[in-house]
Amino acid sequence: MNTILICDDDKDIVSALDIYLSSEGFATLKAYDGLECLRLAESNPVDLILLDIMMPGLDGIRATAKLREKYNVPIILLTAKSEDADKVLGLNIGADDYITKPFNPIEVIARVKSQLRRYTSLGGKNGGGSAGDPALLTNGGIVMDDGAKVVTVDGEQVSLTPLEYNILLLLMKNPGRVFSTSQIYELVWNDPSLGSENTVAVHIRHLREKIEIDPANPRYIKVVWGLGYKMEKA
């Protein structure tokens, strides 16, 4: 059973999300501020976090940054329509997705299940590669063991979020091929690409920071201006 940590200072929202998720067979943990969220994540196995942006004390943006220092579990931000800048900031610091309030229960469940599929496919709870998957991908100093879901760069293991891993996997499997931002979004997020350029760019920037010696002058993930991104053969 997957465990979802719900964090929002509005107790009615937490209660509603608890009902939606419990009805789908998920276990839940409930927090009402950012600090309580961090404490629960530290002391309990958690598979996904639903995290409100606007909270007193430690808000969702700062909580996301602190969570990303230790954990790779998917984080879905809960936002208001007026918080567009915060959505971008949240994605910049490591959130995987966001849901705009007021939300539809069906959308919440669909997004939670989508993120969990990615997480478990990358070796999260009950996860792991299938026996028929290509076990090892290499390019220059990058070694990607897709069976163990481990990435090393120049012999050092790097920690990637599920979305970063899947972007890298797509590019590593197709060295030299140019993918548009729309193609990357649709193949990795499994959703239609609607205004996804900034979302993809943010995740690729984070990925470069983890695998490139000089992210400003990347050796591996190259931009092809006006077309998209490719994995340079090294």
Where does each model-flagged region fall?
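Positively charged, aromatic-enriched patches within helix-turn-helix-type DNA-binding elements
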Residues: 150-220, 224-227
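Short, Lys/Arg-enriched segments at the junction into DNA-binding effector domains
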Residues: 3, 114-178, 182
